[in-house]
Amino acid sequence: MTLFLRIFTFGCLLLLAGCTTTQPQRDQVNWQKERTRLEQLSHWQLSGKMAIITVQQKGSARVNWQQNGDDYRLNLTSLIGTHILELSRSNGEITLIDNEGNPHQSQDAEALIYQLTGWNIPVQGLPEWIKGLPGKAEFELNPDSSLASVRDGQWQIVYGDYRDQDGYRLPHLLTMTGQGSRLKLQINQWTLAR
C-alpha cells in the first residue's frame, strides 16, 4: 500500500506542477548593448534620499543631482529643507557651497566634502554608478543582465529596485560601503534629457 501511495502522490505532484502557470521572465538584456546605451546617457537628473552612517555619526539628506556631460550639480538638503551643501563641477572647476553660503574650491570633491561634513561620499564614481555602470571596476550581473554589484577600490556598491524609465532600466536603490561609511541612496525620480 505504501508503494501505491508514493506513486499516487508523485503522480498528483506531477499533475499539479503541469497545471501551474509560470511568470513570464523579463527578456535578457544584452549587457554590452545596454552598457553602451547607458554610457551615452550623459544628461540626466535625479532626486531622492540618502542615509549616511559613519562610526562617528548618522545622517540623512534629500538629494538632487543634475548631470550635464562631465559637469554636475549635487544639492543636499536636510529632510526639513535646510541647505547642507551644494557641490558643482563646471569646466573642471569644483565648488562647494557650505550650509552658511560660503564657497570652497578644490580639485578633489571627495576630500572637500569630507573636510566640511565628515562624510565620505564617492563623488568621482557616482555619475556612472548611479546609472548602473561599473566604470573600470569589477562587477557582477543579475540574471537579467542588470548590474548587481560593483567593487571599485575601497567602495562596494550593491544595486536594487531596477525600474524602466524612458527606455532605460535604471536602479532606484544603491547601497555603498567603504572608507568607514555606509551610504544608502533611494532614488525617487529620474528625469532623462532627450
Curated annotation (Swiss-Prot):
InterPro entries membership: LolA/LolB/LppX, OM_lipoprot_LolB
Keyword ATP-binding recorded: no
Localization, UniProt: Cell outer membrane
Main location: membrane
Signal sequence bounds: 1-18
GO-annotated cellular components: cell outer membrane
Keyword terms of this UniProt record: Cell outer membrane, Chaperone, Lipoprotein, Membrane, Palmitate, Protein transport, Signal, Transport
NCBIfam families in the cross-refs: lolB
Name of this chain's protein: Outer-membrane lipoprotein LolB
Organism name: Aeromonas salmonicida (strain A449)
